[in-house]
A protein has these predicted regions:
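Metal-dependent catalytic neighborhoods of phosphoester/phosphodiester hydrolases
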Residues: 15-17, 40-73, 88-93, 184-193
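Active-site regions of metal-assisted phosphoester/phosphodiester hydrolases
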Residues: 1-34, 77-268
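A short beta-strand submotif of the Rossmann-like class I SAM-dependent methyltransferase core
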Residues: 37
Length: 268
């Protein structure tokens, strides 16, 4: 099974069409099974539209939705779902999306923050889906968590909620996304996740390519100019991970966001 995660930072750049085409090309050419996306945006005042049967979500989709545009480029070969999480940059519904080549049999939208104020930029949710691939069912969550030392909405409270729902699943589970959790900081977010029993798929991989997933200044990390590893794919068991590679970094496929992506393959 091939799983890609990417914080798309969508609708924020002038070259959205090229970005979409690059992402769709990689998904198709590499035959990726599941794609977990964060910062998937649509303009709040854009026109609402109806989607075809491959959209399995319940939330309203606007005509410029980034995931909708990606679905069209993928020519209906993937099921997909989307949730809006909060207002982004005063004009977007900022949300999460998951694409799957295989049937999505269930989904859940989990509020991670104390606040449920849609207009508050620190609001966080996780989108989870159950996917059936042949005889095997597994769960994938996509999430974009906050910062360890945030006074209002600290990482630890968000993580406890995500861990509570994800750890309850009696099947393989993958947590994919932007965790704002540099792996070099001791006794903080990264080590908290590991201490709760989750496996960093990079540690399990037989072949590893790349490290940093964000380079230079990005939102929330104004002083992080040397590069950070803050995007991850975690699993709840010692999977046979074949490879873990940083992608869309300008070396391994073109840069399409202020984050790089991660592509993981295991034998599920």
């Amino acid at each position: 099974m091939k799983l890609l995660t990417l914080n798309t930072h969508s609708l924020s750049d002038a070259n959205e069409d090229n970005k979409l085409k690059a992402i769709a090309h990689v998904i198709s050419s590499r035959d990726i099974d599941v794609i977990a996306l964060q910062e998937v945006n649509q303009t709040m005042n854009a026109k609402s539209i109806s989607c075809d049967e491959h959209y399995v979500g319940r939330d309203i989709i606007k005509e410029d939705n980034f995931a909708l545009a990606l679905s069209k480029l993928l020519e209906g070969k993937y099921y997909w779902t989307y949730i809006p999480v909060k207002v982004g940059y005063d004009r977007f519904d900022e949300g999460l999306a998951i694409f799957s080549k295989h049937k999505i049999s269930a989904s859940e939208n989990t509020l991670l923050t104390t606040t449920n104020d849609y207009s508050f930029w620190k609001k966080r949710n996780a989108l989870g889906v159950e996917i059936k691939k042949g005889p095997q069912s597994f769960y994938v969550y996509t999430a974009h968590l906050g910062w360890w030392d945030d006074d209002e909405e600290p990482f630890i409270k968000q993580w406890k909620k995500l861990n509570s729902v994800a750890a309850s699943k009696d099947m393989p589970v993958y947590l994919a996304g932007d965790f704002n959790a540099p792996d070099v900081l001791k006794d903080q977010s990264y080590e908290t996740i590991k201490n709760d029993g989750w496996k960093d798929t990079r540690d399990l991989a037989k072949i590893v390519s790349g490290r940093f997933t964000a380079q230079g200044k990005i939102d929330g990390w104004d002083e992080a100019v040397d590069g950070m590893r803050i995007d991850y794919i975690w699993c709840n068991r010692d999977e046979n991970v074949l490879s873990h590679e940083v992608i869309f970094d300008g070396k391994n496929e073109p840069v399409v966001s202020d984050h790089y992506g991660i592509l993981m393959e295991d034998n599920l």
